[in-house]
Swiss-Prot record:
Originating organism: Chlamydia trachomatis serovar D (strain ATCC VR-885 / DSM 19411 / UW-3/Cx)
Pfam short name (any one): LtuA
InterPro entries: LtuA
Protein name as annotated: Late transcription unit A protein
Length: 46
């Protein structure tokens, strides 16, 4: 479970970085990440 969660969070980090690099809307607030690449998508990172 820990490894799956770690890979999941890692994917979110990479996706957020790529989205920000492409100039798309990315907002990080606390433990939550909003990515506006394919519409309003909300990722909750624990």
């Amino acid at each position: 479970m820990f490894f799956i969660r770690a890979r999941f969070i890692g994917f979110l980090d990479v996706h957020g970085y790529l989205a920000a690099k492409k100039g798309q809307q990315v907002m990080r607030s606390g433990s939550s990440i909003w990515v506006g690449s394919h519409g309003p998508i909300f990722y909750k990172v624990f």
